Amino acid sequence: MAEFDKEAYAERERSAASRKTLLKKQELVNSYKERLQKSNGFVIFFNFQGIDAYPLTLLRLDIKDLKGEIVVGKNTLFYRAFSDTVLSDHRDIFVGPTAALFAYEDPVAVTKKLVEFLKETFDKEWEGRIKGGLLDYKYITPEQVKELAELPSKEELIAKLLGVLMAPVTQLAMTLKAVPQKLVLVLKAIEEEKSKGGQ
């Protein structure tokens, strides 16, 4: 019977574990790429250091309700996933604790929610938390992220548009309603004139 080689066995185990780790990392990189594609090239990176687990979980739920997602990941994997975008020129984003915010419907709504949360959590120091990101696969600075958060959301824009579209219809309805009322008043005035003239 052959003697058991502990070192060879240990090496095979390390090699198998290493392959599993590499596969897992590649799966994460692919999932980040899929999220970016699903979000039509929208992602914002922010520093989550100092945010307790419970508030971060609540933020994640709020973002999920707005059809978005927050992912906490390793900078090397984020960089690998986004290295084929303009973010490859902005490696400074991938330094320190990093979370990614994806929006699958309304980027403005999820950005507003993130900025609101950061303001509540960090008061005056919130601005340094935003690292930048992508909008339609184009790089956006932290300042542009703040400007994005100040835009009206999709729902607000739809409400304003409906108001603009409904104004002429409402005016027409009021005009049409006023015509019979004015006619009645004119007829009443004629009737009063005749009754005065007849006496």
UniProtKB/Swiss-Prot annotation:
GO biological process: translation
Classification via InterPro entries: Ribosomal_uL10, Ribosomal_uL10-like_sf, Ribosomal_uL10_bac, Ribosomal_uL10_bac_type, Ribosomal_uL10_CS_bac
Keyword rRNA-binding: yes
GO cellular component: cytosolic large ribosomal subunit
Pfam families assigned: Ribosomal_L10
Function noted in UniProt: Forms part of the ribosomal stalk, playing a central role in the interaction of the ribosome with GTP-bound translation factors.
Family, as annotated: Belongs to the universal ribosomal protein uL10 family.
NCBIfam families xref list: PRK00099.1-1
Designated name of the protein: Large ribosomal subunit protein uL10
Organism of derivation: Aquifex aeolicus (strain VF5)
This protein's encoding gene: rplJ
